[in-house]
Amino acid sequence: MLFHGSRHSPEGAQPRRIRGYAPGVTFTEPVDTPLALLLLGQGSDAGSERGVDCPGELPAASDPNLAARAEAAKRQLGERLFVLGHHYQRDEVIRFADVTGDSFKLAREAAARPDAEFIVFCGVHFMAESADILTSAAQQVLLPDLAAGCSMADMATHQQVLEAWDVLTDAGVADRTVPVTYMNSSAAIKGFTGAHGGTVCTSSNAERALRWALERGGSPDRKVLFLPDQHLGRNTAVRELGLGLDDCVVFDPHKPGGGLTTRQLRDATMLLWRGHCSVHGRFTAENVADVRSRVPGVQVLVHPECRHEVVEAADFVGSTEYIIRTIEAAEPGSSWAIGTELNLVRRLASAHPDKQIVFLEKTVCYCSTMNRIDLPHLVWTLESLVAGGVVNRITVEPTVAANARVALDRMLALP
């Protein structure tokens, strides 16, 4: 059983055995190519990141002292520094995190450390924005690589959502529609949501957020505009709230009127934004059937950002934290196929060698933008702080931050 890395790896890359995988299970390590990262990072040339030049000079990735340099910088900064690491980060980066977790946990951890002057967020852009919103003005949030964005978050721009709201207004349904935005969205979208009476949600509390939205004001014909991930919205509505698939319609911001008729907008309960996760959206029902045929007794565990047919075919569905807890509690000798980002799957396999843990898809799939945060960028960020410089600071405009904070606070107050 070979996990091929042909889409990401140069010809001749060697497969590597990972502890915790069943005998004979190998995969070829993906190698990030400048072209792939350029496209995902939205830069205009290979020397820029997200269209913004990277100031300073990065340490060479081949420097054998990178880890020691990171440790030394952390020691010098002491309590002034707090490093956050998302579960999807590389091993070389996650080892330096003071706290690991999903996006919302990390944002809350940042807010709980008012003594930390510098918060280095090893994640992606929207996560650093949320940390900036939830922390004090005296704290500075830094993102080691500005090209570490999120394709899903980028699928819903503020202008697109404003235009969508105009469509709902023209259809006569805006006054009974509550926006619910996934944590994986920009600060501008969270701000829109807060200003229009809505809330933020995570993959672990999406059910509570949707129930709150549909019950808001006691109106029996409430609607939800769920963005930017259609799959999480659909899976939660159908599996947790008991709605039918025909109660959900997809609003496509690239089509006039969202590609929907006025009747469709009025009849639907869930207006799902046409967005998805580039990693979780890759998994298919065929992947589930294939792994069941190859691994006897395998239990399939997937993230709710997966397509509805994948979630329906799986045995267990839950957030990143749920996936981790499920594997930790699993019986020794049990077999698992996990449908989420590869860095986390590999880390779980390594941490639980008494269980057979495999990636749901044969082709390896990292979150390429998350994977941009590497050790050279982390060392550059930390050493810049030691030298008295602040690089790649993430700040959210005060009005946007205030409205986004309203939406985040509504989530925290959910019953």
Predicted features along the sequence, with ranges:
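Low-complexity, intrinsically disordered/propeptide-like segments
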Residues: 5-6, 42
